[in-house]
């Protein structure tokens, strides 16, 4: 091939294409695949891109007819009470699971799983947790692999307690969104072609309004919205939508986003710099990449031969790593065990957890206990959607939304597991730098149990950035105790401890 001859893939495809085969649909089997697919689609890989990447514009005309009457909500709430999940250890708090309609005419309903605080539920705040993808389940990741009260054993049948669950500090609501994710569904097939950031924020808003009719004691309660990965879009977009519609029963206090997709350009640049700084690629490879590849292009571009060669080398250097935690073991045997593995503990990450969760949530008795899959969906439950056909809009940045929220007094915390290679700490630092914030406290370690829990810096305008030492993309999966400590300090609006005595 002649020097300078064009290649059909954009530069980002060179690292991501091996993670998820390029086809016209958005579905993928895991969070890493789903996010990779989105980036490929945004840059026109595998065909021309029609995705809208302009700044987020919330739906302003959410019609009252979309908001379900509260008349029968008490009965629905009683029906949603989970008596006990199969294989569950005893607990002292209530759990609920069920559906909330977000669009009556389309037959669009979202599945939720709600766990009350383990103590002081009547005074504890409400946390809504969203996972990203786009197209991945908060039940699969947030609830059963990260911050929920249970984890799934290797037998795919039984559960064990997460002593560092976030319902130690809050009432926690997990949402599968948008329709087509997990147990959430639509009776209108064309809905699956209309997904994007804008419609997802609108539906999430309507869900929350209707859910509060079912659980009215949480109206006016301190509300926090949190999430990871592509929820770096979902969370500030929903917060913006809430503020836009001025409903008095929302008492939005803050947002919390982890290893979050914030700004495409800095997310990509930070990923490559992280690879080099962590000895995954050579200095020469990084220099050649920056010299020969256009890392700033927001649409499909032609790649030179030199760019293709160095990109292929980076592929080879990073292909056999778990990019979501570069130091984590890989799942080499996903076969379920007859009995739970001996010595299973919340502090030890199991790379095969995805498989245990998928087996558990596809058990008919589990779905019955959760009040899930009532319509008998024509496909198995999956951690990331296989039915969402298209993602129509995804802004290149959510920085304007974050700054807007700060300007309205909303507390913003951004955290980063420091072993994630997909949206690494370098990406987040570059994105924050682009915001031109003024530091309030200098960069310093924070502590838990006499050890460094991570590093943190506070900025004027109610924004805190914190790393979590030894954590990957799904921070609570790898460092449950440190993540809970961070969450509690976020809720209390107190600085992370700057002394090893803590």
UniProtKB/Swiss-Prot annotation:
Source organism: Arabidopsis thaliana (Mouse-ear cress)
Free-text function comment from the UniProt entry: Probable carboxypeptidase.
Tissue expression profile of the protein: Expressed in roots, leaves, flowers and siliques.
GO biological process per UniProt: proteolysis
Keywords assigned: Carboxypeptidase, Disulfide bond, Glycoprotein, Hydrolase, Protease, Secreted, Signal
Gene transcribed to yield this protein: SCPL40
Sugar-bearing residue positions: 103, 187, 333, 373, 436
Main location: secreted
Protein's UniProt name: Serine carboxypeptidase-like 40
Domain of life: Eukaryota
Database matches in Gene3D superfamilies: 3.40.50.11320, 6.10.250.940, alpha/beta hydrolase
Family per record: Belongs to the peptidase S10 family.
Cellular compartments annotated: Secreted
A matching Pfam family: Peptidase_S10
């Amino acid at each position: 091939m002649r020097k300078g001859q064009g290649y059909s893939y954009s530069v980002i495809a060179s690292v991501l294409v091996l993670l998820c085969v390029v086809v016209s649909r958005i579905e993928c089997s895991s969070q890493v695949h789903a996010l990779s697919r989105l980036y490929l689609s945004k840059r026109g890989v595998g065909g021309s891109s029609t995705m809208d990447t302009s700044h987020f514009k919330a739906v302003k005309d959410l019609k009252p007819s979309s908001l379900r009457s509260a008349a029968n909500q008490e009965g629905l709430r009683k029906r949603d009470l989970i008596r006990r999940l199969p294989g569950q250890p005893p607990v002292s708090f209530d759990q609920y699971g069920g559906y909330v309609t977000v669009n009556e005419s389309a037959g669009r309903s979202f599945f939720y799983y709600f766990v009350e605080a383990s103590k002081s539920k009547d005074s504890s705040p409400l946390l809504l947790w969203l996972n990203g993808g786009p197209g991945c389940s908060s039940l699969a990741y947030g609830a059963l692999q990260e911050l929920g009260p249970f984890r799934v054993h290797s037998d795919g049948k039984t559960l064990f307690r997460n002593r560092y669950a976030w319902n130690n500090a809050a009432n926690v609501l997990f949402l599968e969104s948008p329709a087509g994710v997990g147990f959430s569904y639509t009776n209108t097939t064309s809905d699956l072609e209309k997904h994007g950031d804008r419609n997802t924020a609108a539906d999430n808003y309507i869900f929350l309004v209707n859910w509060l009719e079912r659980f009215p004691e949480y109206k006016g309660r301190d509300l926090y919205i949190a999430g990871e990965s592509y929820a770096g879009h979902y969370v500030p977009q929903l917060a913006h939508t809430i503020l836009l519609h001025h409903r008095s029963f929302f008492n939005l206090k803050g947002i919390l986003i982890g290893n979050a997709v914030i700004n495409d350009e800095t997310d990509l640049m930070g990923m490559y710099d992280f690879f080099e700084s962590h000895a995954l690629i050579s200095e020469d490879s990084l220099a050649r990449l920056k010299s020969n590849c256009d890392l700033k292009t927001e649409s499909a571009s032609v790649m030179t031969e030199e760019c293709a060669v160095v990109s292929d080398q980076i592929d080879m250097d990073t292909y056999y790593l778990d990019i979501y935690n570069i130091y984590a073991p890989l799942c080499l045997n996903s076969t379920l065990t007859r009995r739970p593995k001996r010595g299973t503990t919340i502090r030890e990450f199991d790379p095969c957890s995805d498989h245990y969760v998928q087996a558990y949530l596809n058990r008919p008795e589990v779905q019955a206990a959760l009040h899930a899959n009532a319509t008998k969906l024509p496909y198995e439950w999956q951690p990331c959607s296989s039915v969402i056909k298209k993602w129509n809009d995804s802004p290149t940045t959510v920085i304007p939304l974050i700054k807007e929220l700060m300007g309205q007094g909303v507390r913003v915390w951004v955290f980063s597991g420091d072993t994630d290679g997909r949206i690494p700490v370098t990406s987040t630092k570059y994105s924050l730098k682009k915001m031109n914030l003024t530091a309030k406290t200098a960069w310093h370690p924070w502590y838990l149990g006499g050890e460094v829990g991570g590093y943190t810096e506070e900025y004027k305008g109610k924004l805190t950035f914190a790393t979590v030492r030894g954590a990957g993309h799904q921070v609570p999966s790898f460092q449950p105790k440190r993540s809970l400590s961070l969450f509690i300090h976020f809720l209390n609006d107190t600085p992370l401890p700057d002394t090893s005595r803590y």
